[in-house]
Amino acid sequence: MTNQQHDHDFDHDRRSFASRTPVNNNPDKVVYRRGFVTRHQVTGWRFVMRRIAAGIALHDTRMLVDPLRTQSRAVLMGVLIVITGLIGSFVFSLIRPNGQAGSNAVLADRSTAALYVRVGEQLHPVLNLTSARLIVGRPVSPTTVKSTELDQFPRGNLIGIPGAPERMVQNTSTDANWTVCDGLNAPSRGGADGVGVTVIAGPLEDTGARAAALGPGQAVLVDSGAGTWLLWDGKRSPIDLADHAVTSGLGLGADVPAPRIIASGLFNAIPEAPPLTAPIIPDAGNPASFGVPAPIGAVVSSYALKDSGKTISDTVQYYAVLPDGLQQISPVLAAILRNNNSYGLQQPPRLGADEVAKLPVSRVLDTRRYPSEPVSLVDVTRDPVTCAYWSKPVGAATSSLTLLAGSALPVPDAVHTVELVGAGNGGVATRVALAAGTGYFTQTVGGGPDAPGAGSLFWVSDTGVRYGIDNEPQGVAGGGKAVEALGLNPPPVPIPWSVLSLFVPGPTLSRADALLAHDTLVPDSRPARPVSAEGGYR
């Protein structure tokens, strides 16, 4: 290689921006990696550029201070701050836009949060969002605008439904769970007084000392003010405590405790059953037309084999002698019949299993009227809370009612009770317990287990008020124009009228009522109660 060629290659390598990083460790024959410049080369180039700029601008290349670099950093920070502000403003405009009235039907004043609804060319002040949605016919949300934007429209009269709910958030539960409790002297959650009628919506809490379902053979003896009743197996049966044939047959004994007073709200929520009296048997005392050693109306017995899973034992079965045959009865009904008239028999005549099999079978008596085993009464001094729990899972054909008893209300910890101002007026409950912030879209049904859900539609709020819904049909079961406007999702949750009637009656939610104009609103004539500024009632 000539010196001229060597100088040309050296000059090319010196002027190129290729990396001069060696890729081998042989000092005799160094091979350089070809590629981009290294970080050290870049920082060195930047330093040279700053030094040249300092020499031109400051006439000093010593660079004891570097004011030009401080200025560039300040400019960069300013640009970053401006960009951050622009991004923040964009995000804020998405979260809280400065709305325009446009074609929006429901508007809200940004400064006062007052609601307005457009009807035709006029802008009407509206009492609440529920009324505005009924007027518009769909569940719209208000568009927040400035007051100057609202002043551009001609103003109309005040319209809306006084007392309509401000917020209607439907509870996600589709199962019907309604509980009515009556406490004599029971603390509710948080130590509040639990005396009176309490309506609970949703699943119950039955842990600890809270009211739980009555056990087998348990019952509650109550006084409704018009008679004595026995609460058992999800129903209430009239009972005469002076009829010792019945009380003894039920296992109450001679010393029956005084019945507890029951509130009408709980009393009406429990379905009525036939009275607990000795059944009337036709031709009682006459000889039977079939071969039994007892007259009609008497009781006979027989032994039957019972398989308990581990052992097989003999059990006594009782039969009532009826005009057309024998009917198997429970020990309680057998005791009631014998206490009423044993027909001179010290013991029920015993028949063989083969003899019973040959005799005709009768079904004259309604054995469901009577408990299948002797009952034990709940000690109301220890368990002063009595409840009726009505439930119907979604899709179920029948409902069920369970009686509860305990020392405290079965209110879940996450649910707080609301004391009703109109408690006791027109059968209104003392308090309600619903999940805060949600309500129930309901439909009334009968109290019976097979009652169909074809009643009126109601909205039950978390403050204990029931609002009737104008259910103008629209082709969907449980749905209508008002239901669609309010944004409610069918199907409604069934609720017995005996439970629904315990809520405070509110106005009907309909478009016709929402379009009523007002000059002013008269004070509420219903009972009121002042609330202190610190919270609670005075």
Swiss-Prot record:
Instruction: List the molecular function annotations (GO) for this entry.
Output: ATP binding; hydrolase activity
The UniProt record lists the EC number as: 3.6.-.-
Superkingdom of this protein's organism: Bacteria
Location (main, coarse): membrane
The record's listing under Gene3D superfamilies reads: Type VII secretion system EccB, repeat 1 domain, Type VII secretion system EccB, repeat 3 domain
Q: Where in the cell is it found?
A: Cell inner membrane
- List the biased-composition ranges (Basic and acidic residues): 1-16
Give the keywords, sorted: ATP-binding, Cell inner membrane, Cell membrane, Hydrolase, Membrane, Nucleotide-binding, Transmembrane, Transmembrane helix, Transport
Under InterPro entries, the record lists: T7SS_EccB, T7SS_EccB_R1, T7SS_EccB_R3
Residues that span the membrane, as ranges: 75-95
Q: What does this protein's UniProt record list under function?
A: An ATPase. Part of the ESX-3 specialized secretion system, which is important for iron and zinc uptake or homeostasis.
Q: Summarize subunit and interaction data from the UniProt record for this chain.
A: Part of the ESX-3 / type VII secretion system (T7SS), which is composed of cytosolic and membrane components. The ESX-3 membrane complex is composed of EccB3, EccC3, EccD3 and EccE3.
Family the UniProt entry places it in: Belongs to the EccB family.
Which named protein is this? ESX-3 secretion system ATPase EccB3
Q: What is the lineage of its organism?
A: Bacteria, Bacillati, Actinomycetota, Actinomycetes, Mycobacteriales
Please state the gene responsible for encoding this protein.
eccB3
